[in-house]
Amino acid sequence: MKTTISSKGIRHSLGIPGTGWSYQTPLKKWNDNNQAPNIGNNSQEQKNTTENDYQKLEFSFLKKLICPKEEMALAQGIQACLLQDYSEAELYLNQALCYVDGAFTLGVIYLNEGRYTEAEMQLAKAEQTPESIGEFYRKYDLGMKMHIEITPYYAVDYEANAMASYIAHVKAFQQLNRHADACRLLLALYKAMPQNLDVMIFLAEIVLEKEPGNQQWMNAIINMTNNLQNDSYAHAVLLLSKAEAFDNIGMTEVAITTLTSVLSKKKDRPLDFLLEAQYQRGVLFLKIGKKTQAKKDLNAVFAINPGYANVNQLLGQL
């Protein structure tokens, strides 16, 4: 069970949650007797996870006397996030910007609220001392994690640390259409961590969206994923991007072979991801005139989701 920080709120999740700060049922305020609140239909484990984080930031009277006011503001800001009171969280966190985690947490909140310019500024501030990002979270052993959607089919969890800030920063750049800045940061991360699949997936996602006709970038994606096998879901997502890069440089049959590799393993793969891979393969079969194979793939997609993309229209052409 994880409590995640993502650009939709703080929430509990057994699997990969959504993007942002999310929390499916807001944590209610503690009553005057300091008893745990009733937070609706969440499981006991979920309630315990969130309440534990909240309680860890409920400082004793003595702690409040000796605690720096900025640290107290940071604690109260994170508590406000747990309550989904982001306006109050912002007020507190703006009093705690001398702490790197004040800027980091505020940056994530701004990302959640679609205030991308402000998010980028706060994350850049936090990254001036990257080794300090997450110190407050570690000090109080908080279970919250950074969560970002990289593609429609793939999201990542990170503890509060420099990597979490960098990935959030890339997301802010992406939303601001500052794709050159996003790629520059991702390339720096790739140079430092050439085996990091999350970085490669994010880089491929942005490049394929904005530079599909750039052969140099397409070759870079292909070379970056050289010898990649379908060993995990992350590998499969990256192979989906690789197939698109192959098709963009005219190597459609190689793209089809790559998609066949993606579809060779279905266990622990989300249905929407598998549908997209099969749909793309069907489209490519149609592109090279292999109508029988195209019809088979597109019919398989239609059987599960008749409204998927333009699958109905494509089948009407066969």
Tell what function each PLM region has.
Residues L65-A73, L97-A103, Y158-Y166, M193-F202, ...:
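Generic helix N-cap/helix-start motif at coil->alpha-helix transitions
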Residues L93-Y99, E127-P130, Y154-Y158, L187-Q195, ...:
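Solenoid-like repeat scaffolds
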Residues T49-A96, A164-L176, D181, V254:
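Alpha-helical segment of the N-proximal tetratricopeptide repeat
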Residues E88-N94, E118-Q128, A180-L189, N214-L228, ...:
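Alpha-helical repeat scaffolds
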Residues D101-T105, P130-D141, P194-M200, Q215-Q216, ...:
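Boundary/linker segments of alpha-helical solenoid repeat arrays
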Residues L83, E113, L176, K210-P212, ...:
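Structural motif corresponding to the intra-repeat A-B loop/turn of tetratricopeptide repeats
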